Curated annotation (Swiss-Prot):
The keyword Zinc applies. CDD domains: ADK (cd01428). Gene3D superfamilies: P-loop containing nucleotide triphosphate hydrolases. Its main location: cytoplasm. AMP binds at residues 31, 36, 57-59, 85-88, 92, 160, 171. Pathway: Purine metabolism; AMP biosynthesis via salvage pathway; AMP from ADP: step 1/1. Keywords: ATP-binding, Cytoplasm, Kinase, Metal-binding, Nucleotide biosynthesis, Nucleotide-binding, Transferase, Zinc. It is found in: Cytoplasm. It comes from Bacillus licheniformis (strain ATCC 14580 / DSM 13 / JCM 2505 / CCUG 7422 / NBRC 12200 / NCIMB 9375 / NCTC 10341 / NRRL NRS-1264 / Gibson 46). HAMAP family: Adenylate_kinase_Adk. It catalyses: AMP + ATP = 2 ADP. This is Adenylate kinase. Consists of three domains, a large central CORE domain and two small peripheral domains, NMPbind and LID, which undergo movements during catalysis. The LID domain closes over the site of phosphoryl transfer upon ATP binding. Assembling and dissambling the active center during each catalytic cycle provides an effective means to prevent ATP hydrolysis. Some bacteria have evolved a zinc-coordinating structure that stabilizes the LID domain. Residues 126-163 are annotated as: LID.
Amino acid sequence: MNLVLMGLPGAGKGTQAERIVEDFGIPHISTGDMFRAAMKEETDLGLEAKSYIDKGELVPDEVTIGIVRERLGKNDCDGGFLLDGFPRTVAQAEALEEILKGLGKSIDHVINIQVDKDALMERLTGRRICKNCGATYHLVFNPPAKENVCDKCGGELYQREDDNEATVSTRLEVNMKQTQPLLDFYEDKGYLVNIDGQKHINEVYADIKELLGGRDK
């Protein structure tokens, strides 16, 4: 089963990815993990990627695509895979089609976890962190017993700058604009399946599991 997982920041991709790979016995392949593994193994492409990352530059598409090609060609992908964080653009999606064609494979589903912007804002701006011990809370989903005070150590809670409304709103807008052409591409291909991510996480996974046909034997 060859899957691509999509969703905006805060949509809950990580939680659902963990469940899918555990239930269906396929590797969870994220862009970050691929880069780290290629750099650790010191492959030619891994070393090339490292040279860009060390300079704080974006890794060019041809290097990223080469690393994806190497990773999908490994034995643990014979029974399928879950791609997360790749592709990000239509050009990368077209390259992925060519990679899979060369491996005699194709995408089964592109799972897009949909959550509206207001709900994402609530999820992403509600996080609070203890200045003292680093414990994480959420004003709605996991609030401290006493406002702005850590349950564990009594330290003061704060909101990271990245989590304020203006920053989160901008990040979501940028992601939406970047993601839409990719969603259109996969919808035209007939791969795209939208999953309602505003339900409880167990209900979201039940919908995904139903799509995938229950537990893979």
